[in-house]
Amino acid sequence: MASTNDLKNGLVLNLDGQLWSVVNFQHVKPGKGGAFVRTTLKNVLSGKVVDKTFNAGVKVDTANVDRREMTYLYNDGTDYVFMDPDTYDQVGVAASVVGDAADYMLENSQVVVARHDDNPLYVELPASVELDIQHTDPGVQGDRSTGGTKPATLETGAEIQVPLFLNTGDKVKVDPRDGRYLGRVSTK
């Protein structure tokens, strides 16, 4: 149990038998009436986002979520297999749990696997990942009808928009949360 005054981003709450992660919170103290906490919560399993308001100081049930850094090994067709680098235990995680993170994971990459009661909840990637461009069409000088970007296929199979000056074989930095191009990685 925790107080609503102790809420922070990333905290997982157990509300009505479902797990909700705090995405955003704001303590509000109006001129008249009691203080309250306005939150944005994301359902850990379904991804549904809702806004919920709590009175300040109310006790809420927190969930014990084990966030463990693991190494992605391989995909066996139905599950993605991860290994704990400390104990060498291997854990299979269903593709539905991994979700869009699979588009940006390479073998032997470090990820965080969150589990509750030994059930995997989600896979969290770093804020940016570096991947090679496997294929992209050459950029044509003066071609600005597309806003200066073109589609590129990464080595994982994901497709993102990149600037026209990038070519096949270049290494780029990508934000795995939304698939946004962040920059080119120097090969020096």
UniProtKB/Swiss-Prot annotation:
Among InterPro entries, the record links this protein to: Elong-fact-P_C, NA-bd_OB-fold, Rib_uL2_dom2, Transl_elong_fac_P/YeiP, Transl_elong_KOW-like, Transl_elong_P/YeiP_cen, Transl_elong_P/YeiP_CS, Transl_elongation_fac_P
Q: Which family does it belong to?
A: Belongs to the elongation factor P family.
Q: Determine if Ubl conjugation is one of this entry's keywords.
A: no
What is the name of the protein in this document?
Elongation factor P
What GO CC terms are in its UniProt record?
cytoplasm
Q: Which SMART domains match?
A: EFP (SM01185), Elong-fact-P_C (SM00841)
Pathway in which this enzyme or protein is active:
Protein biosynthesis; polypeptide chain elongation
User: Taxonomically, which superkingdom?
Assistant: Bacteria
* Signal peptide, first to last residue: none
Task: Quote the Gene3D superfamilies the UniProt record gives.
Answer: 2.30.30.30, Nucleic acid-binding proteins
Keyword field contains Iron-sulfur: no
The protein's GO terms of the molecular function aspect are: translation elongation factor activity
Q: What does this protein do?
A: Involved in peptide bond synthesis. Stimulates efficient translation and peptide-bond synthesis on native or reconstituted 70S ribosomes in vitro. Probably functions indirectly by altering the affinity of the ribosome for aminoacyl-tRNA, thus increasing their reactivity as acceptors for peptidyl transferase.
Could you tell me the keywords of this UniProt record?
Answer: Cytoplasm, Elongation factor, Protein biosynthesis
Q: What GO biological process terms are annotated to this protein in UniProt?
A: peptide biosynthetic process
Name the predominant localization: cytoplasm
Q: Which organism is it from?
A: Saccharopolyspora erythraea (strain ATCC 11635 / DSM 40517 / JCM 4748 / NBRC 13426 / NCIMB 8594 / NRRL 2338)
Subcellular localization is given as: Cytoplasm
